[in-house]
Design a protein with these regions (language model features):
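Active-site loop signature of alpha/beta-hydrolase-fold enzymes
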Residues: 37, 92-94
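Extreme N-terminal starter segment of soluble prokaryotic enzymes
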Residues: 1-3
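Short acidic, glycine/proline-rich loop/turn micro-motifs
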Residues: 96-101
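Alpha/beta enzyme core
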Residues: 75-84
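Glycine-rich, positively charged N-terminal anion/phosphate-binding segment
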Residues: 8-76
Length: 111
């Protein structure tokens, strides 16, 4: 069985993940809170810096409904040494739903 630490808005920053890993360990992957801008702000950048994620398999999560933003962020994250990203296709968080970042709602008939 694999154990993943899912992101929780406002809680699972790199400080939380680092402390969890130090105290409890046991996670196969640690997912970051989503990045939703083509240009990462300082909080988002700090969250994915390799030196803030030592000893953990960290997977940055991208939330966007624009292909060019996804590609730009994926390229930036590759520059930090990441080989995997998670594309969030529909976060139930109120702050996300209110801004219409979710992908699946627009294509419910396809599903």
């Amino acid at each position: 069985m694999k154990y993943y630490l899912a992101p929780m808005e406002g809680l699972t920053t790199y400080n939380f993940r680092t402390n969890w890993n130090h105290c409890y360990g046991g996670m196969d992957k640690y997912f970051t809170p989503f990045i939703s801008n083509r240009h990462m702000n300082s909080r988002e950048r700090n969250d994915v810096l390799p030196e803030h994620n030592v000893g953990m398999y960290t997977v940055p999560q991208i939330l966007t409904n624009k292909a060019e933003e996804f590609l730009s962020l994926a390229e930036q994250l590759a520059g930090y040494g990441y080989h995997e990203v998670n594309l969030n296709l529909g976060c139930p968080s109120g702050t996300v739903v209110a801004v219409s970042y979710t992908h699946l709602r627009a294509h419910e008939t396809v599903l």
